[in-house]
Regions:
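Positively charged n-region of N-terminal signal peptides that target proteins for export
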Residues: 1-7
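A broad helix-preferring feature
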Residues: 2, 18-20
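Bacterial N-terminal signal peptides
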Residues: 7-17
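Extracellular/lumenal and peripheral-membrane lipid-interaction modules
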Residues: 20-193
């Protein structure tokens, strides 16, 4: 579920243009990201989008994630992202009992995914040719790294049945004619074509 959360969060960052621009003006960062999202949406509707880069900085992205404009799946709270060259690190507090609701497993390896945990996820992410790509490098629960094969079991059991396009490696269409997305130091740069 952490993988799903990271994937979802990464998609939010890269796909910020897909979000609606609400009137919640609780911070300058949120107001700024809402203006940029509105620009991306409007630019994406034109016959020839302006290819000038749109840069979303980390403070804007995190203000957006903390706002009521993003609805995370049940059990996922306090999401925060940090960007570096080509990589994203995400943190969240996750109640796995809520995340796994309705799906049970007798596999003892999956028992670590129960209760409330602080989750850290590191991933590589980029967009090219209108497609977004995410590869989850590692997931830790309360500072303890989850072995990759256990993470894969979790994804197969709890993520893929509900979200078949999300996994350790994910590929998805970028919205609003976004052609490329580059994660940089504390920012993501989006170019439309």
């Amino acid at each position: 579920m952490k993988v799903f959360r990271l994937r979802f969060l990464l998609c939010v960052v890269i796909l910020a243009a897909a979000a609606s621009a609400a009137n919640n003006k609780t911070s300058p960062e949120l107001a700024s990201v809402n203006r940029k999202i509105a620009h991306l949406e409007a630019n994406g509707r034109t016959p020839r989008p302006n290819p000038a880069p749109t840069v979303l900085n980390e403070a804007e992205i995190n203000a957006y994630l903390a706002s009521d404009q993003v609805q995370f799946p049940a059990g996922v709270n306090s999401v925060h992202l940090t960007g570096s060259q080509g990589t994203i690190s995400g943190t969240a507090k996750v109640d796995f009992d809520q995340v796994r609701a309705g799906i049970h497993s007798s596999n003892p390896l999956l028992s670590i995914f129960s209760g409330v945990h602080n989750v850290d996820v590191d991933a590589h992410a980029y967009g090219r040719g209108g497609q977004g790509y995410v590869h989850v490098d590692s997931v830790s629960l309360d500072g303890v790294e989850v072995p990759n094969f256990v993470l894969q079991l979790f994804v197969e059991k709890y993520i893929e049945p509900r979200n078949p396009n999300i996994g350790i490696d994910s590929r998805f269409k970028l919205p609003d004619r976004i052609d490329s997305a580059a994660v940089g130091q504390h920012q993501v740069t989006l170019i439309q074509k």
